[in-house]
Amino acid sequence: MAEITAKLVKELREKTGAGMMDCKKALGESGGDMEKATEWLRQKGITSAEKKSGRITAEGLIHSYIHTGGRIGVLVELNCETDFVARGDTFKDLVNNIAMQIAACPNVEYVRVEDIPEAVAQKEKEIEKGRDDLAGKPENIKDKIVEGRIGKRLKELSLMDQPYIKDQSITVAELIKQTIAQIGENIQVRRFVRFVLGEGIEKEEKNFAEEVAAQTGQKVEQPQAAQETAKVEPPTPETVEEVEPPVTPPAQETDSPAAETTTEPPKTTPVDKPKGSPSKKGKKKK
């Protein structure tokens, strides 16, 4: 494989008008062959796109996209050079696909890395420096690791650097370059905003019965068992010691202690004989 020199990259850039990084990548993919690199750039739609990137884009569309369920919404402005292109199906499909891309990427906040404020980049850098896995490493090694991580992190915030949701082999930037080559006009994503339902609002926890009661002005009564359960507190060591055992009521007293275990036969009461009735023993013979 031929060495990719700065001179070779410059030569390809002057020939095609493509960006430096695109030229370097094309030479790497083609093994340093200039003709193959040029063909690779043409296939990616990069050659003509770079030449048109400086043109003014004052036309275009502001497109809205509402995701299924109505919980995520996107507004995006995509610019082109002429109104004729803006009204074409190719441009409309592109702006809709970009809006869907934004809806699918919750971390994306900026169009490109160059749009990220320096304060945000510096804050991300401080976060990376404070990670535990960098503790004890030499400063020069730590700086290299941080630079690599911060570059990756900033790309996560950039729309242009996201893998295209319908074709993960290309980025959103490459998708736009391919469309530029197809329609022959410069295209730029100017700005976008992403809405999420309820974002930033602290939600109050309510059950369905309480919500209905709040709307109708009625009071929700809990079941008696639930109220008693809610009042019962778990015993503590102090309360356990103070609890007295339950008092058992005294047993009913009986005449004889053995009455509980021994059953005596019932006593018979003698019947008095009526007066005037002589007994057999006292009867005299005449």
From Swiss-Prot:
Compartment(s) where it occurs, according to its Swiss-Prot or TrEMBL record: Cytoplasm
Range of residues in the leader sequence: none
This protein's UniProt keywords: Cytoplasm, Elongation factor, Protein biosynthesis
Pfam families: EF_TS
Cellular component annotations (GO), alphabetically ordered: cytoplasm
Region described as Disordered: 212-286
Low complexity composition bias: residue spans: 253-269
Stretches that traverse the bilayer: none
GO molecular function, one term: translation elongation factor activity
InterPro entries in UniProt: EF-Ts_dimer_sf, Transl_elong_EFTs/EF1B, Transl_elong_EFTs/EF1B_dimer, Transl_elong_Ts_CS, UBA-like_sf
CDD domains the record matches: UBA_EF-Ts
SUPFAM superfamilies cross-referenced by the UniProt entry: Elongation factor Ts (EF-Ts), dimerisation domain (SSF54713), UBA-like (SSF46934)
Annotated segments matching region Involved in Mg(2+) ion dislocation from EF-Tu: 82-85
Compositionally biased intervals (Polar residues): 215-227
Chief location category: cytoplasm
Entry's family note: Belongs to the EF-Ts family.
Function recorded in the entry: Associates with the EF-Tu.GDP complex and induces the exchange of GDP to GTP. It remains bound to the aminoacyl-tRNA.EF-Tu.GTP complex up to the GTP hydrolysis stage on the ribosome.
Record HAMAP family: EF_Ts
Name of the protein this chain belongs to: Elongation factor Ts
